[in-house]
Amino acid sequence: MATCSICGKRAVTGNQVSHSNIKTKRTWAPNLQRVKLLVNGTPRRAYVCTRCLRSGKVQRAI
């Protein structure tokens, strides 16, 4: 299961409920992007959620 390397966000599980109220298990996955980051001055690839990218918690390598 993929996890955001910054905030630790991961997929959550719950029920998918049909119109006839039949419940089946399903997962909601975070929107993860594989980006190149600067970690201690060296570029590294990591999976980061889009919330961390938008909020500026990540310094991207170019």
From Swiss-Prot:
<keyword id="KW-0689">Ribosomal protein</keyword>
<dbReference type="GO" id="GO:0003735">
    <property type="term" value="F:structural constituent of ribosome"/>
</dbReference>
<dbReference type="InterPro" id="IPR034704">
    <property type="entry name" value="Ribosomal_bL28/bL31-like_sf"/>
</dbReference>
<dbReference type="InterPro" id="IPR050096">
    <property type="entry name" value="Bacterial_rp_bL28"/>
</dbReference>
<dbReference type="InterPro" id="IPR001383">
    <property type="entry name" value="Ribosomal_bL28_bact-type"/>
</dbReference>
<dbReference type="GO" id="GO:0005840">
    <property type="term" value="C:ribosome"/>
</dbReference>
<dbReference type="GO" id="GO:0006412">
    <property type="term" value="P:translation"/>
</dbReference>
<dbReference type="Pfam" id="PF00830">
    <property type="entry name" value="Ribosomal_L28"/>
</dbReference>
<dbReference type="GO" id="GO:1990904">
    <property type="term" value="C:ribonucleoprotein complex"/>
</dbReference>
<dbReference type="InterPro" id="IPR026569">
    <property type="entry name" value="Ribosomal_bL28"/>
</dbReference>
<comment type="similarity">
    <text>Belongs to the bacterial ribosomal protein bL28 family.</text>
</comment>
<dbReference type="InterPro" id="IPR037147">
    <property type="entry name" value="Ribosomal_bL28_sf"/>
</dbReference>
<protein>
    <recommendedName>
        <fullName>Large ribosomal subunit protein bL28</fullName>
    </recommendedName>
</protein>
<keyword id="KW-0687">Ribonucleoprotein</keyword>
